[in-house]
Swiss-Prot record:
A biological-process GO annotation: proteasomal protein catabolic process
Pfam family, one: Proteasome
GO MF: threonine-type endopeptidase activity
Protein species of origin: Pyrococcus furiosus (strain ATCC 43587 / DSM 3638 / JCM 8422 / Vc1)
Protein name according to UniProt: Proteasome subunit beta 1
Gene name, Swiss-Prot/TrEMBL: psmB1
Length: 196
């Protein structure tokens, strides 16, 4: 029996910060295992990643990034930027391209500036204003393309991200739409909430 899993995660960058959003459903083949999984993982108090793919691979990569961020801070006396962490993660993924981590990750943060990046399992790295990962990507991207503007406020970006995840949940059977995990990161820090 072929096992299929899915999810939808999105990231949006605006002038005041970044918004990450994800559904909270975990599915395996035709079964919903839980409606309460967190798919956005804080790495520092200013950087987080979203998860699409192998849970074990993402958890291991998150632990590695947390350790690297602490080491960087102790060595240099300042936090690692989101761009630096994205490049580090890209290198880690690329070094393992022959035995890849089965993940697609959005990294978002606000250290010196708001930053969003999308990484594929082989280390391909794209910095953008908005992005999506997971099985519901085509549906989420359609909503993001229609609604994104450079002058969005952080609250407007949050509403757009929620709309994108919910649109994917209505059309992609592996994406849940009942509850959305949302993380906003601004110069003032990180805030997590769950929207029902």
């Amino acid at each position: 029996m072929e096992k299929k899993t899915g999810t939808t995660t999105v990231g949006i960058k605006v002038k005041d910060g970044v918004v990450l959003a994800a559904d909270t459903q975990a599915s395996l083949d035709h079964m919903v295992e839980t409606l309460n999984i967190k798919k956005i993982i804080p790495i520092t108090d200013r950087i987080a990643i979203t998860t699409a793919g192998s849970v074990g691979d993402v958890q291991m990569l998150a632990r590695y990034l947390e350790a690297e961020a602490r080491y960087y801070y102790f060595t240099w006396g300042r936090p690692m930027t989101t761009k630096a962490m994205a490049n580090l993660l890209s290198n880690i993924l690329n070094e393992n391209r022959w035995f890849p981590y089965l993940v697609q990750i959005i990294i978002g943060g606000y250290v010196d500036e708001p930053t969003i990046a999308n990484l594929d399992p082989f280390g391909g790295l794209i910095f953008d204003d908005y992005t999506a990962t997971g099985s519901g990507t085509p549906f989420a991207i359609a909503v993001l393309e229609e609604g994104y503007r450079e002058d969005l406020t952080i609250e407007e970006a949050k509403e757009l991200a929620i709309r994108a995840v919910r649109a994917a949940g209505r059309r992609d059977v592996y994406t849940g739409s009942k509850k959305v995990q949302v993380v906003t990161i601004t110069k003032d820090g990180m805030k997590e909430e769950f929207v029902v």
